[in-house]
From Swiss-Prot:
GO terms for molecular function: all-trans-retinol dehydrogenase (NADP+) activity. This is Retinol dehydrogenase 13. The gene is RDH13. It is a peripheral membrane protein. Widely expressed. In the retina, detected in the inner segment of the photoreceptor cells. Weak signals are observed in a small population of inner nuclear neurons and the inner plexiform layer.
């Protein structure tokens, strides 16, 4: 029997080391134990993946959670799941289609009318590397949903967020933003040959630029805004890439994926952290990679690009009277 002890001990050591390495590489659990009783939280794209897990985490902490999703059947099912698991009955589903400016305006109008406050807005929903689709209003899908939809939604809810201050806005970006570039001559991919990867990277860079500019405009308001990269997660977001479902991925790359790819539960920890951590109460305009604050790509910190993107985004979504007043941009 003793001859098996050494191999078993070695195997256990290796397995333990692998688990510790995975925890180190993929981040870890939200270090904050703060609760949010009585606070109203909106999570977009919360019917599945990171969004659902984020809503679950915040429901456990006592929040009044609003799941904002396009597919109401899935959204209602997710809300029911979360209520059952957390015994928090203040979890509700609302319809929001970020590919429709009309839907965004209708959603915001109902929130403003029916909700006493909005303490936390988590712009989680996203589209990744889809075919060359367009939104209801004719925008390239990834730029339209990932950036423009959340840009409009956030601006429409700013007065409610300011009235609820201190409040927080969390924008989910991606490490892919470092490969992005804002092409002001063709934001909508009307003249260039469509490149779904480049379009995705552009949309994620736009989110970080939006975060930076919004933070500047919100100084002194009691509302903070930060962007984050949640990590690579095994969710429906990557369904258009095909990589998670391929035989090559599941066999040859299996060990690497196990090490680097997060579960939705783990990928929801950064959003949870930015939403509740007391030590982040006054942190704004920053970019987080997982649970750690890091410098974004150089273009993401270009103030002139951020101002120009804001002005163009406002024009595209018809935001004639932004909630946050600003001096005219220099010509």
């Amino acid at each position: 029997m003793s001859r098996y002890l050494l191999p078993l001990s070695a195997l256990g050591t290796v397995a333990g080391a692998a688990v510790l390495l995975k925890d180190y590489v993929t981040g870890g659990a939200c270090p904050s134990k703060a609760t949010i009783p009585g606070k109203t939280v909106i999570v977009t794209g919360a019917n599945t993946g990171i969004g659902k897990q984020t809503a679950l985490e915040l429901a456990r902490r006592g929040g009044n959670i609003i799941l904002a999703c396009r597919d109401m059947e899935k959204c209602e099912a997710a809300a029911k799941d979360i209520r059952g698991e957390t015994l928090n009955h203040h979890v509700n589903a609302r319809h929001l289609d970020l590919a429709s400016l009309k839907s965004i305006r209708e959603f915001a109008a109902k929130i403003i009318e029916e909700e006493e406050r909005v303490d936390i807005l988590i712009n989680n929903a996203g589209v990744m590397r889809c075919p060359h689709w367009t939104t209801e209003d004719g925008f390239e899908m990834q730029f339209g949903v990932n950036h423009l939809g959340h840009f409009l939604l956030t601006n429409l809810l700013l007065d409610k967020l300011k009235a609820s201050a201190p409040s927080r806005i969390i924008n989910l970006s991606s490490l892919a933003h470092v490969a992005g570039h804002i092409d002001f001559d063709d934001l909508n991919w009307q003249t260039r040959k469509y490149n779904t990867k480049a379009a995705y990277c552009q949309s994620k860079l736009a989110i970080v630029l939006f975060t930076k500019e919004l933070s500047r405009r919100l100084q002194g308001s009691g509302v903070t805004v930060n962007a984050l990269h949640p990590g690579v997660a095994r969710t429906e977001l990557g369904r258009h890439t095909g990589i998670h479902g391929s035989t090559f991925s599941s066999t040859t790359l299996g060990p690497i994926f196990w090490l680097l790819v997060k579960s939705p539960e783990l990928a929801a920890q950064p959003s949870t952290y930015l939403a509740v951590a007391e030590e982040l109460a006054d942190v704004s305009g920053k970019y987080f990679d997982g649970l750690k604050q890091k410098a974004p790509a150089p273009e993401a910190e270009d103030e002139e690009v951020a101002r120009r993107l804001w002005a163009e985004s406002a024009r595209l979504v018809g935001l004639e009277a932004p909630s946050v007043r600003e001096q005219p941009l220099p010509r």
